[in-house]
């Protein structure tokens, strides 16, 4: 049995002093203890990057050594997913895009290929069409799968919301986000992964007509959505640069956390965005330090609940109770 006494953020709330007991890779208890008997630093659940494009074992290593124990992926091969014994890769088995003639068939094929959720790419409001998108959502939900939709325009966000998507990936940048649309997102229980690190990169890339002056609209969207009570998910869109501006693996999640603080979330709320929030949004059995949960966690130097930059000061990482060297 392993016992650890530290200040702790459990994915939902803060403990100034907690004793965590671990046996056979599973947390058996989390109990309050005297902060004076705790070590320096803070325990956090293993971090979750809610939107990535994994392509190699090197990407897996970069994620793990940045304290990320779970990723929600679009691009990883089945072989990479199955060979990754420490980093949990929640895959979508590709994405729906363009013309989808048989929405139900697409979802069934993705599920057969190992999809744990369905990803839909909406370049614009005409790229898939309302009937096909609604069909994908209906078929996915019937199989118990969540649907995450890439939407970077107000029109595509509306389309995804109307279709009943569960998660929105990215936020529009070329125009301010409407308050009534944020209300609709909250009312439907949709979570949003703004990927600010990608939006910031796009804004300075000159690609797709983006300009640096567009980035404040992304920040405005996050502030508004957060104020309305929409769950925010930390996500980077980490990718090698083959289809979008490259965003690195692992360390960029900590940059994302900083950008979320800049956009108006508190450090404690941002920690939720990288742990409990994505676990709830994707229906994952991780992201929380509680009895019965896998002992995926990290010890950081400092207090990231007060200074979010401390999230990157990683001292130790555990996956299922085993320390990562």
Descriptions of predicted regions:
Residues 6, 20, 25, 40, ...:
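Divalent metal-coordination and catalytic microenvironments
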Residues 291-325:
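C-terminal cap of metal-dependent C-N hydrolases
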Residues 217-300:
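His/Asp/Glu-enriched, well-ordered alpha-helical/loop segment
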Residues 1-33, 301-307, 322-323:
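N-terminal metal-binding scaffold of metallo-dependent hydrolase/deaminase domains
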Residues 60-147, 152, 181, 187-205:
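Divalent-metal coordination cores built from histidine and acidic residues
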Residues 154-162:
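Catalytic cores of alpha/beta
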Residues 114, 161-168, 186-191, 229-231:
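Glycine-enriched alpha-helix->loop->beta-strand junction motifs that scaffold or abut catalytic
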